[in-house]
């Protein structure tokens, strides 16, 4: 190896060592795309809604970032922010459930895995629930179920459309049957919302699985999804072992579900607000100032 090659290798090692693999972690200047391995300047990635400029991969984002994309500036009013999970079963596997809660709360600044509230989208009202995968994999426990149910009930009372941004590994096993019952509770609240002919849209992001998919994620009047999002109930390996068949490579992706009629539209993150605006207008949602006159 020549001296020039040696210096070039050293520079490459130093450069790569400062690259983060995850947009949610670290404060490095550079981020490597988990899909195509392209290295991007962090500020450029953030300005593009955390979507890779090279391959279009939609990196995972947190609830605050989601709200900023969807809601008009300073329009989001959060509800039920003080609700916090307990440990009704005294559950312990490798670690105590209570310790897992504390760790997730400290790491995310959230009390549980969903943020709910009312906002406006280009001056039109929208009830909004945003699940945050950082909090115990977006799992649905009793607090997540209660907060989503409450925002649906508020939307029903005030005749607002609702959008639920789904990002979840499913029901939270540490709460047992209390977690599973949230599926029925949320579905019941959505039924009353539907009876008033109000619009409900789930946005399926990566990943949307388990009990969330088996309940409110698939009950929308219009089901939206982000590109290449993993959407399903059981895992691919479980299904293949059960059926003893090899599944298609794109199985359980947003594109596969769109092709087979389970998803209505795939929306790129940069187009989400414009798409929501068009849908709300088509469904006759009035701007707040107009609705109050």
Swiss-Prot record:
Disulfide pairings: none
GO function term, MF aspect, one: zinc ion binding
Pfam families reported for this sequence: Carboxyl_trans (PF01039), Zn_ribbon_ACC (PF17848)
The keyword Transcription appears for this protein: no
Zinc finger motifs (C4-type), residue ranges: 33-55
Limits of the CoA carboxyltransferase N-terminal domain: 29-293
Record-listed E.C. numbers: 2.1.3.15
InterPro entries named among the record's database cross-references: AcCoA_carboxyl_beta, Acetyl_CoA_COase_Trfase_b_su, ClpP/crotonase-like_dom_sf, COA_CT_N, Znf-ACC
UniProtKB keywords: ATP-binding, Cytoplasm, Fatty acid biosynthesis, Fatty acid metabolism, Lipid biosynthesis, Lipid metabolism, Metal-binding, Nucleotide-binding, Transferase, Zinc, Zinc-finger
Cofactor binding note: Binds 1 zinc ion per subunit.
Reactions accelerated catalytically: N(6)-carboxybiotinyl-L-lysyl-[protein] + acetyl-CoA = N(6)-biotinyl-L-lysyl-[protein] + malonyl-CoA
Residues annotated for Zn(2+) binding in this entry: 33, 36, 52, 55
Keyword Ribosomal protein: no
Compartmental location: Cytoplasm
Pathway(s) of this molecule: Lipid metabolism; malonyl-CoA biosynthesis; malonyl-CoA from acetyl-CoA: step 1/1
GO terms under biological process: fatty acid biosynthetic process; malonyl-CoA biosynthetic process
NCBIfam families linked: accD
Family: Belongs to the AccD/PCCB family.
Self-association state and partner proteins as the record states: Acetyl-CoA carboxylase is a heterohexamer composed of biotin carboxyl carrier protein (AccB), biotin carboxylase (AccC) and two subunits each of ACCase subunit alpha (AccA) and ACCase subunit beta (AccD).
HAMAP family: AcetylCoA_CT_beta (MF_01395)
Protein name listed in UniProt: Acetyl-coenzyme A carboxylase carboxyl transferase subunit beta
Gene that encodes it: accD
């Amino acid at each position: 190896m020549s001296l020039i090659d040696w210096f070039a290798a050293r520079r490459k090692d130093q450069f790569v060592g400062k690259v983060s693999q995850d947009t949610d972690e670290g404060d490095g200047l550079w981020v490597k795309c988990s899909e195509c391995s392209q290295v991007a300047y962090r500020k450029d990635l953030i300005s593009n809604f955390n979507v890779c400029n090279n391959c279009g991969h939609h990196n995972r984002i947190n609830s605050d970032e989601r709200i900023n994309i969807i809601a008009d500036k300073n329009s989001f009013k959060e509800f039920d922010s003080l609700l916090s999970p307990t440990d009704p079963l005294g559950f312990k596997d490798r670690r105590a459930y209570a310790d897992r809660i504390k760790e997730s709360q400290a790491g995310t600044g959230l009390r549980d895995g969903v943020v709910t509230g009312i906002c406006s989208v280009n001056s039109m009202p929208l009830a909004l629930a945003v699940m945050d995968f950082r909090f115990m994999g977006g799992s649905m426990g009793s607090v997540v179920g209660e907060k989503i149910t409450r925002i649906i009930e508020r939307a029903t009372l005030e005749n607002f459309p609702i959008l639920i941004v789904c990002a979840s590994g499913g029901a939270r096993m540490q709460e047992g049957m209390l977690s599973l019952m949230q599926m029925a509770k949320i579905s019941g609240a959505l039924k009353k919302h539907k009876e008033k002919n109000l619009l409900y849209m789930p946005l399926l992001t990566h990943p949307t699985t388990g009990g969330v998919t088996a309940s409110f994620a698939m009950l929308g009047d219009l089901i939206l999804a982000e590109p290449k999002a993993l959407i399903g109930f059981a895992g691919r390996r479980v299904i293949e072992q059960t059926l003893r068949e090899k599944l298609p490579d794109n199985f359980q992706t947003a594109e596969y579900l769109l092709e087979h009629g389970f998803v209505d539209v795939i929306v790129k993150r940069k187009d989400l607000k414009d798409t929501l605006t068009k849908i709300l207008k088509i469904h006759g949602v009035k701007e707040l100032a107009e609705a109050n006159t």
